Swiss-Prot record:
Name of the protein described by the UniProt record: Zinc-regulated protein 8
Keyword tags: Cytoplasm, Zinc
Subcellular location: Cytoplasm; Bud; Bud neck; Bud tip
Species name: Vanderwaltozyma polyspora (strain ATCC 22028 / DSM 70294 / BCRC 21397 / CBS 2163 / NBRC 10782 / NRRL Y-8283 / UCD 57-17) (Kluyveromyces polysporus)
Region (Disordered): 1-72, 296-374, 722-758, 776-859
Top-rank lineage group of the source organism: Eukaryota
Bias (Acidic residues) ranges: 334-353
One Gene Ontology CC term in the entry: cellular bud neck
The gene coding this protein: ZRG8
Presence of the UniProt keyword Cytoplasm in the record: yes
TM annotation in the entry: none
Amino acid sequence: MRSFIKSHKNSNSLDGSQSRWNNSEVPNVQRSSADSFNYSGSTVISSNSNTVTSMSIPNNLPNSKNYSPKHTPSFESFHRLANKIPSKLFKKSSNNALNATYNNSLHLGESLSSPPTPRTINTSTDAIQKVRSTESEIEIPSIKGTITHSWGTRSDTGGHSIIVLNEPRSSLSGASNSDYSDLEPAARISGLKRPSIVSIKTNNSFEEYNSTPIITEEEDLKNFDSKIINPSTPNDINAVKYNNRKTQIIGNENLFRTSNLQNKVRKHFISPLENLNENVLEADNKQGVVENVQRKKKVPNLNASPQDTIDGNRSRTISFAETSKTLPQMEGASDADGESDSCSETTDDDDDDNTSKFSFEYNRPNGRTASMKYYSKPEPVNNIYIDDLYEDENFDENMNYDEDSLDGFEFPSNKFDYGNENSDENDDIQGHENYVVQDNNSSKGPKLKSEAPKKVQTYNDLFDLSDDFDYDPSDEYQNETRLIHEMCEDGEASQIDNMMVDENIISPQKSLTSSKSFNNSNVSKSSPLIKPLETPKKKIIVKPVASFADIFNLDDEEDRDFKDDDSCNDESDGEYVLKDPFNIPGGKNLLNRHKSLKKNSSFSLKKIPSNGDSIDNNLMDKKLDKYIVDINKSIKKHSDIPDLHFVPPDNSSDIILPKRSQSLKYHDLSSILDSDVPGSTRDLFFIDEAEEDSYNVKHGLTEEEYLDEINNVPEDFYFSDSEQDMSPMKSPFRRSNTGSFRRTHSFSGKPIGAAKDNTPVKSKLEIKNKTVTFFNHPWTPNSQSGFSGKSPKKSIKKTDNLENSEEEHLLATPKRDDSSAYGFSTPDRQFRKPTPEYLQDYSLSPIQEGYSSVDNSPR
């Protein structure tokens, strides 16, 4: 500290003395390596040029050893103080940073307070070597290597170039070095340069880059390779980096403006002929597209001779690949025009299979760039597997089974001709006697009759069975006709010839307007008519519901039959109603046809007769009236096969209507929905509450039985057993209140809104030093006590039942006098002494400590 004060005093005595400046020259003095700083001179880098100027110390100094420039004494004293402090606090790297900081302040101080006659000295290699020698003693020695191979284009110089890693390069030197390559980190490069100079040089390089004239490719490649390998000045380095940066950011507008250094597309490619080439290429591509479309649309002529094909039938085609190869095209032009890579191919001189597909930049701190070429891989098609069925098993993309390929099978979708517009024209032909009805599949050729499967006689015949046998609807037709003949053999064979069976129901593939008889002698146009078989039907006579008691006599099956028999008897609104289609032969087929025809909106019903003029007279029987369906009226409503609906009966004698004096209930009101819903609430049985109550009284049904059933009380539970035993222990209330109490407390597990414990109440009370036990002692009421009452007795009463007249044992209410009732009696103001029996019954005896009835009681 004393040396610091002493040096500070000496430095202050030298300030402001102009007499100390002498004309004698003082050589450049360099301090020792311990001071690690040179005060002999300073260098200043001018912003307008790349030259480095050195300012020397004036020669007329009296004492060169004690010389210190202005504003430097504080630094000198601080530097000495820092050398005396141990090196652990100030490491060598931090010391170098301080030296660099104060070196800059020294240059600024000398530039501001310079002597009157300074002398400038040009830069020389000796001065630069001295500065480098001082830094080489401190910094890490450099590492040299040799470039053996590189990506991209090789230089014309050839040979192996030497690279130097971590070269101790001073920021003061601006001379070119052929051995040097800028491979230092980006932070060090940016720290060695001033921001103002870098920004000025960047702008200058951008202007020079845009204003450069068009040069040849060879000269441009040589200059570019020389700049990359041997960058002479920071200006060239910045220009190369800026160009590389511009090549990374390429848009639609900058595609033809910037020079792509990586792909070597030079400026001489960009010329005024570029727009013309694009127009020609676009026109050729459009022509090729049109010709390819015309080629695809052209149907090949199978009957044409080979000579005709050679002469003129061969169409000219131009593919996209051939079009792109005929004209020079830049890489990326197809992307600008919106064309895919699969349709166009670019021809480049540098495209070779041996070259790398990666792009590499020289003199970049981070090395290889992230830009690379990606190749799209075709995604494999996922196969669809459904229970070991592959995608070729007639499944479409929506996982629906395709039935179009199964035309030979009998499916509902293959039974009708959709949109047969020529049905009107063929009506006259169908009326001919020799008219033959053909199937839909007749145009495909004669139908081969499938072999009938063998009958199963042995176990091995089971393996010969197959599902591939075609279903023939004629088999079903023959089976039905055979059943009809068998059923009608008994005296009804004469009606078979007159009975018309609609063949469309049995064989839907045939014409809908033609009908055949069993003898195949008469073919005429008629509406579909079905005559039912008159089979005897046994009806169960059910007593109609006239009272509330009749509801319990109904069975489920009887109730259903009762509703079905009386549902449809008469005609309503002039419409014919089909009674029960499932009881008629072929009625199910009619409903199935009705469902299938709803899907086909193009089905025509123009030729179905609306009146009965064309029907034969022998068919107009009264028995058939109820089964004839008037199709004309139903077509107006639904434009389809008529719906089979049921009409409620007109006579409602079985329904009990409410009296006018009674209150109207909710289910008696008719709503709009009642007319649409069959079997609405107005058809339900009316329940009279007065009649219901009389029925319950008549049969002895009370509300207590319903409550016991709700509370899950067992049927064999007899309340009198517990009532007789517990009657003395009950509270002495009136007997009339016990019924309501039992209705509310008849079940112990009835949910209440409180927490409870189902464990029985303990009969002992445990205290700190003893246990008190309570015993339930049965006692008989004594006449001397203040209580009076009688126990209930059983009485047998015979009741005559109106229906079964059986004797029932009922628990009668106990007989009681008017004077004696349950409850406290009025005292007679005569108090008697308690008898010993009373004291024995109602007094608590002392607890025996020796033995106790409770095992855990204390002794």
